[in-house]
Amino acid sequence: MLRRKRAFTDESLMLMERGLPRLVTTSTTPTPTTEPTTEPTTTKDETSQTSATDASTATTSTAATSTAATSSTSTDITATSLTITSSSLSTDVANIVPPSAENNPYIFRTSALSGTVFIAVGSIAGAILMLIFLWWSITKYLNYKRTKKDYLESMATQYPYGSRGGHAHHSSIFSTASSDVYSYGGDDEKLSLGHSRSQSVDKKTHEKVKKSKIGLFGGSTNDIFKTPTRNDSWESLSDAITNYGDGSVHRFNPIQDDIQYNNRRSLFISPTVEVMNLPRQEVPDIFATPKKQQTSIYNDYDTPLIPDLSKPEDVALSPQRSHRKTPSNDKYHRRNRSSANLSPSRSPTRTPIRTRNMARDHRKTPSMYLEDLLDDNY
């Protein structure tokens, strides 16, 4: 029995070498074994002797069993701990060495730099963009020059006295006047000095003429910028200036521009416009003769400039209150696109004050009517 148990214990230890350690406890119950005897017991002493022998045998077997169980448990734990501490893992890696590329026909070799294709494509695209930018710049510059040239030509056509013509006439009048002034001295140096001064003042005066009221009101500058000669006098030059001021400056007249005056949509009355619409007072000409100072430059007949205030009919029929017909009126309406000359005037015609006074003399006053009634009653 003990051999079998030891053999079983050794087999279990061999099977449990790689497992986890565990505590194994075994318990055995002693079973008495008796061998059958063929010989009968005849005496009482022999029977008691046999019982004592069996009891001692059973006790011995129980002690041996417990000793074997304890020894097997301790041996199992020791074997398991020894197996865990002695286990190890080792791996072997092979060292790979690539073969040499020399004399190998299957390896591609190149001498160009890396990214050559990208550099080539970028260079072509940049060249195209540069060509487009150059074409745009040249086209813009040519268009600017062409537009500036057309603008200057149109300005010279629309305003001949503001850009080129006025410049020439303006320079000519100053140069001629200076030459006339310095020619009486008989000195050529003074003549050249006056001509150089006229050229230096030319630019400043040209800008002033462009920004003056002459260009705003659109008057003709043929008279004032007419080049004088040596035979012309200062009186003729002053007459030209006076005629220029007479025929070019016109204000808004509600009687002449009847359509624009009646179509007003605002009830506001501007005092500035009313003052500007008043008859203009003429400035006496300091270069004219005394006879010309007393006459008006708007008519051909001799009429006093300041009428006699004691006679109302003269005041009513004075040239300042009558409609002035000058050659520049047609230009004024044509420039403003006004149809006042085409449509009849809606303003009532004025009758002379003398005629109205004569009509009033023939009428009867209320007192005269009462006197007639009283006379009839008597």
Curated annotation (Swiss-Prot):
Instruction: Identify one Gene Ontology CC term for this UniProt entry.
Output: fungal-type vacuole
Q: Carries keyword rRNA-binding?
A: no
Q: Which UniProt keywords apply?
A: Membrane, Transmembrane, Transmembrane helix, Vacuole
Q: Where is the composition biased (Low complexity)?
A: 25-41, 48-70, 343-356
Entry-linked InterPro entries: PRM
* Region annotation Disordered: where it falls in the sequence: 18-70, 299-368
Q: Which organism is it from?
A: Candida glabrata (strain ATCC 2001 / BCRC 20586 / JCM 3761 / NBRC 0622 / NRRL Y-65 / CBS 138)
Segments passing through the bilayer: 118-138
What is this protein called in UniProt?
Vacuolar membrane protein CAGL0J10076g
In the UniProt record, does the keyword Transmembrane occur?
Answer: yes
Principal subcellular localisation of the protein: membrane
* Location of the protein in the cell: Vacuole membrane
Stretches of Basic residues bias are at 321-337
Similarity comment:
Belongs to the PRM5 family.
Q: How does it sit in the membrane?
A: Single-pass membrane protein
The organism's taxonomy opens as: Eukaryota, Fungi, Dikarya, Ascomycota, Saccharomycotina
